[in-house]
Amino acid sequence: MAEHPPLLDTAQILSSDISLLSAPIVSADGTQQVILVQVNPGEAFTIRREDGQFQCITGPAQVPMMSPNGSVPPIYVPPGYAPQVIEDNGVRRVVVVPQSPEFHPGGHTVIHRSPHPPLPGFIPVPTMMPPPPRHMYSPVTGAGDMATQYMPQYQSSQVYADVDAHSTHGRSNFRDERSSKTYERLQKKLKDRQGTQKDKMSSPPPSPQKCPSPISEHNGLIKGQNASGGNTGSARNRSGRGRSCTQVDPEMEEKDEETKAFEAFLSNIVKPVASDIQARTVLLTWSPPSSFINGEVNETAVPELFNYEVLVSSTGKEGKYRSVYIGEETSVTLNDLKPATDYHAKVQAESNSIKGIPSEAESFTTLSCEPDPPNAPRIANRTKNSLTLQWKAPSDNGSKIQSFILEWDEGKGNGEFCQCYMGSQKQFKITKLSPAMGCKFRLSAKNDYGVSDFSEEVLYYTSGCAPSVPASPVLTKAGVTWLSLQWTKPSGTPSDEGISYILEMEEETSGYGFKPKYDGEDLAYTVKNLRRSTKYKFKVIAYNSEGKSNPSEVVEFSTCPDKPGVPVKPSVKGKIHSHGFKITWDPPKDNGGAPINKYVVEMAEGSNGNKWDMIYSGTTREHLCDRLTPGCYYRLRVYCISDGGQSAVSESLLVQTPAVPPGPCLPPRLQGRPKAKEIQLRWGPPQVDGGSPISCYAVEMTPADKDEPRDVYQGSEVECTVGSLLPGKTYSFRLRAANRIGFGPFSEKYDITTAPGPPDQCRPPQVTCRSATCAQVNWEIPLSNGTDVTEYRLEWGGVEGSMQMCYCGPGLSCELKGLSPATTYYCRVQAMSVVGAGPFSEVVACVTPPSVPAIVTCLQEISDDDIEYPHYSPSTCLAISWKEPYDHGSEILAYSIDLGDKQPLTVGKMTSYIIDSLQPDTTYRIRIQALNSLGAGPFSHTIKLKTKPLPPDPPRLECVAFNHQNLKLKWGEGTPKTLSTDAVQYHLQMEDRNGRFVSLYRGPCHTYKVQRLSESTSYKFCIQACNEAGEGPLSQEYVFTTPKSLPAALKAPKIEKINDHICEITWEYLQPMKGDPVIYNLQVMVGKDSEFKQIYKGPDTSFRYSSLQLNCEYRFRVCAIRQCQDPTGHQDLVGPYSTTVFFISQRTEPPASSNKDSVDSARTRRTLSDEQCAAVILVVFAFFSILIAFIIQYFVIK
């Protein structure tokens, strides 16, 4: 409410949303001072004059006030604020600032707030203080005495990036060093006075009130004595730190610390800055959330991009906010705002579906502008000579509407308008008009910012006389029970004049005259519920507010007739003939109000036929149906046609014509070529079946030299074979068909001549066996049937049903050679002529005499796996098998095996034999022949077989490497790289707990590692060698014993410094190993020594080393020793040493530097952690696994 002080930044004051009071003290002489109260534009200051009346002074203005005692009087401020006296270049100013730790530099804005109440330090405050003045404009109503309360608007240049250069009245503000220090002291006092800590950067300062007071709103602006207090209360409720109105959100308590920290980071966002404020647009900019919270750096991971949501409210800071923007940009231009309206904007940050608390609200007010376009004026009253128009005021957009401008076209209708009224009234009466005169009007509003756009154009008419006689109604469409009528306006009637019409109707037979059927403003009407085919008279009367017109001329229209009813089902008149019949029918019972014009008869063929053909159309009610097919079904129906339309079809009549015998068939035809004794005939059905299906055919044959016909076929088939004919004879055939009525006429005759016949069947041939492999066949000449025999065919075979032709020629005998002894053969003979081949003779069987056996086949070696002979040795034996040959009629008695140089072997009747007593690794040529009582058969094919060498002896087995779990065995003199294709294979076996030897390894390698054994345990092994000759003998039993296991490697020892010369080394404890005690050996290497020295050996797990030297480097390591008690005596098993630990002795510093000593001590105790040791072991294990896999791949598989 006063001038912005130079000490406190204007942007800081404005961001707190309070009204300011700055009272510059003009004279500081200590007696009487004049205090100037600066009232900012848009604000008001209430004082009480000497006469006791209250006066409201609106800004911009300076109000001089006198201080009688020379001191600065107390300034009344609302709750949550405090007055501060600041001296600037000899001028003291009273500044109202908020009591909040949140009073910090922020965004820039312009605030128009409600004025403060009167200052009690200057004027007495009565009991009944009038309420402070309301806001000086309202964009909603736009009416009233707004001119006296108009508030000048700020321009967009009021928002600056440099706060020090901001001044409301254009005066430059300055800040010297003294004022800066004063400002810092003021900020510190405000924070100390507040006494509370803020939860988040976005939370407003706490309020001394328990609950926020109700906030009223007018035109989107907050009013009340302390709008900031309401905002504070709401923010405290959100953060859960209010006193009596506190609400705790249970979901916030369940969130983890990381989510809470990230929400706090997102909530640390500064309120947006409003710039470039126009009447309907504003530019909002903001910055991403800051990583500094309460002066500390937030270690929460900051994402690269944020999503921002801009919330805007026009109903006050505590009003309802709506989202106007969601995106990743840090600036947005808001459009479609209301002019001269207070808005409050917040921004809310979001990332990974986590939202922060919205920022503080940035308040701004849009600029005023010209009014909105008003609505078109409405007609309030009209007469024949005047029109009275009314209208409503539009939104004034922040400036009171000064006048309205009403224009009209003077009734000319040429589109040119002139002003007929300008003033502040909201109605106007235009006089001196003509009756039924049409005028166009438009309206605009004007304020201090200009003239609005014109409203829509409207056309209004003055009142006129009663309507003239309208034209007669016209029939547009007629139906059976309705008539659609249409009429026009009377001539010369204005288009906007409200005219109603009365439609009257008269029915000829009613006798009641005309009756109204319609009364309204429409120009068309459909009269319903009329009778069909009836005439009606109509007339129309027009009327308005001035009276009724004369009725129009009477017109007459008729409704349409209805379609007739369904005719009666047609019936047959007289007898039904095979080719026609007569039908008749009766007219429908209802003709639809019009005479029947014609009847239509339709007919469909078949009992279920749907293809209807029209066969009659006329006025008579009977019809002769002719040219029909006998024995066929016909369906007939009838319908009638009148002026009202076509009726539905009647029920169908089903009629069947009587059947007749079928018509003549076409002569039968020869199918294929005629044969000597039979012919094949085929025919088709007759063209006319007589109305009944063909059930039978009859074929009649007559020889050419005889006149005695006879039936050769009767049946339903369309083909037949006529046999028992003579070759070269002529025969006549004719055909007839029959149905259920009877046979039809014969067809024409068809002559066919048979072909010449082949020779007759020969008599059975005679077979004479000359030897076991040769036979003679003889036959006789058969009857030739009129043609000479040209050749004979002899078929011969060992199976009766599968004989092959072995001779073809004119001879009467044939000699067959190459026959099998003691075999049954079959033969037959056939004679042929130029006509064809005669039938074969009967089959004759003969048997050839016996002979020596046939050749032996399938001679082969028997596999070793298939031999079950216990004394078989592949080195001295050969096993052969063969297939038994044909014995040729004499039983096989024995077989002779030829081995080449050796004497042939004679064996009994068998098909396999093992030849023994052979030389190892020797090749033999073997063949075999069969023997019977008639002699020896031919030798079989020769095969070459070779005996295998003798199996090898077992190698010597020895143990080349061992530990407590593994034994590496070696045998033979093989090279390390042994191929899997080596001839010699080795089979290693080990004795199990049950005393049985189990297989460990079978392959060509000469070494094998036995794993997962028990320590200090004896195991028995044996081995045998194998090659293609077989498995060699087992070796003797070898006994190998595993040693005891060594202790495991210890972790790196821990070193703790006792003083400058003593340190304590500790290490982990190992459990006794299977009853054997464990002791420890501690070694140290001092300085640049190259060897470790033992400093302790015993069962303890710690040792104090007291020979430390200052600034000297020590290396410690420790190992475990297992003390074994064997029957042979005492034995120590030393385990691997632990990781070496480095230690540097340094002088102990005073206690003040205890932190540094702890750091140095920590540095001297750098050892590998358990995780690092596990990682190293895992890497080593992986390396050795890969190496072993490579060795197996290279030496074993390849």
From Swiss-Prot:
Location(s), subcellular:
Golgi apparatus membrane
Q: Which parts of the sequence are annotated with region: Disordered? A: 188-257
- Provide the positions where the record notes the PTM N6-acetyllysine: 384
Q: Where is the composition biased (Basic and acidic residues)?
A: 188-201
Which Pfam family name is an example for this entry? fn3
Supply the InterPro entries for this chain. Answer: E3_ligase_FN3/SPRY (IPR050617), FN3_dom (IPR003961), FN3_sf (IPR036116), Ig-like_fold (IPR013783)
Listed A to Z, the keywords are:
Acetylation, Golgi apparatus, Membrane, Phosphoprotein, Repeat, Transmembrane, Transmembrane helix
GO CC annotation: what is one?
cytoplasmic vesicle
Q: Where expressed (tissues)?
A: Testis. Localizes to the acrosome of spermatids, as well as to Leydig cells. Can be detected on the acrosome beginning at steps 2-3 and continuing until step 12 of spermiogenesis.
Q: Where is the Fibronectin type-III domain?
A: 268-369, 373-465, 469-562, 566-660, 664-757, 761-851, 863-950, 951-1045, 1049-1151
The membrane-spanning stretches of this chain are 1177-1197
Q: How does it sit in the membrane?
A: Single-pass membrane protein
The record's similarity note reads: Belongs to the FNDC3 family.
Q: What name does the UniProt record give this protein?
A: Fibronectin type-III domain-containing protein 3A
